[in-house]
Amino acid sequence: MNTISPEVKTALVTGTDHGVGFSLAKKLLSRGYFVIAVRIDETEKQIDALQSSYPNQMAIFCADIGSDESVFKASNDIKNMTDHIDLLINCAGILGDMNKNLGDDLDFDEIMRVINVNAIGALRIT
């Protein structure tokens, strides 16, 4: 069941919990886009407040961009909403534990977790 009209420009933005992803979602809403906001943290309420200002112009989905299963579930839910996305903006990213990434004893599991989200995650969501 598609609920977004094909005439409406639709943007999917990841990392909308806060920061750049949140700011871009806000700007796109002000320009008339329907925004599909993807976040990882349901406790971040900033994006919820934005949705209350644009209730008919926004949908929020939770997904861990570092997880195939999580992205697959979110993408199926999004496909039920729309059959088109005009603009995809990948803003989801993590720094990881900097002590494990920059210290003398590198933690390669932590480094791979960061790469999985920041590099592979962008491909996964695309």
Residue ranges of model-derived segments:
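Conserved mid-core segment of classical short-chain dehydrogenase/reductases
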Residues: 95-112
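Conserved hydrophobic beta-strands of the Rossmann-like cofactor-binding core
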Residues: 10-13, 88-89
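Conserved glycine-rich cofactor-binding loop
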Residues: 17-18
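Conserved glycine-rich Rossmann-like NAD(P)H-binding loop of the short-chain dehydrogenase/reductase
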Residues: 31-47
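Hydrophobic positions on the long internal alpha-helix
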Residues: 89, 125-126
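The beta1-alpha1 cofactor-binding region of Rossmann-like NAD(H)/NADP(H)-dependent oxidoreductases
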Residues: 62-73
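N-terminal Rossmann-fold NAD(P) dinucleotide-binding loop
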Residues: 21-22
